[in-house]
A protein has these predicted regions:
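Acidic donor-binding loop at a coil-to-helix junction in glycosyltransferase catalytic cores
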Residues: 141-148
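A recurrent flexible, glycine/aromatic-enriched loop bordering the glycosyltransferase active site
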Residues: 22, 90-124
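The conserved acidic donor/metal-binding loop of glycosyltransferases
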Residues: 41-45, 69
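Conserved donor NDP-sugar-binding/catalytic core segment of glycosyltransferases
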Residues: 51-92
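Acidic donor-binding segment of Leloir-type glycosyltransferases
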Residues: 1-15
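Short aromatic/hydrophobic "clamp" motif used to bind/position activated sugar donors
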Residues: 37
């Protein structure tokens, strides 16, 4: 069982103005005081066993970065990418409805360097490793995750947790649908 002392919980507001997601993620991660940094989008959900699974993964001192499978829900409906590109799926129940668990690709230079196949979420770094590789690039308005995942793979020891630990909600406000998506593609 993993417990968090809520007296240690804190929110550090970002006082600047920026359009660079890399700057915001770097600020948030460097403000954290824990040993493991877990990336969670404000509009997504962690599964109830997520924190315990991450704690088990990072109990191995050799692990610098861990990532899991995820479930993508597109405007409230189950979502799947075309399996002809190598995507694999398993049934996954969430919030009383049948969804699909997207099985993340195994760690490799190809999967970590191409944003289409890179680990989605949950993603977690050992804090000292995150700092050692320079964290998120504050100059990045998009593709900050492709950049940091490439550096993570090159310099770190990676663990894929073969369980769905993250529910990703795709909607009109995501960058995967917004004006920046054409640049990302």
């Amino acid at each position: 069982e993993v417990r968090v002392d809520l007296t240690q919980a804190r929110v550090v507001p970002y006082s600047g103005q920026t359009r660079n997601i890399g700057e915001l993620k770097r600020f948030a991660c460097l403000a954290c005081r824990g040993d493991v940094l877990v990336e969670v989008d404000h509009d997504d959900e962690l599964t109830p066993d997520c924190v315990a699974e991450l704690a088990a993964a990072f109990a191995d001192p050799r692990v610098d970065f861990a990532y899991s499978n995820c479930c993508e829900i597109n405007d409230g409906k189950p979502w799947r990418y075309d399996e002809k590109y190598g995507w694999r799926y398993r049934p996954f129940a969430w919030d009383g409805q049948q969804q699909w668990e997207c099985v993340a690709f195994d760690p490799s230079p190809a999967s970590f360097s191409k944003i289409w196949f890179a680990p989605n979420h949950v993603r977690a770094w050992r804090a000292n490793f995150y700092r050692r590789i320079g964290g998120h690039d504050p100059s990045r308005a998009v593709l900050d995750d492709q950049d940091i995942l490439s550096r993570t793979y090159i310099h770190g020891r990676v663990k894929h947790i073969d369980r769905c630990l993250y529910v990703y909600h795709v909607h009109a406000g995501n960058t995967c649908r917004g004006e920046q998506n054409s640049f990302i593609q």
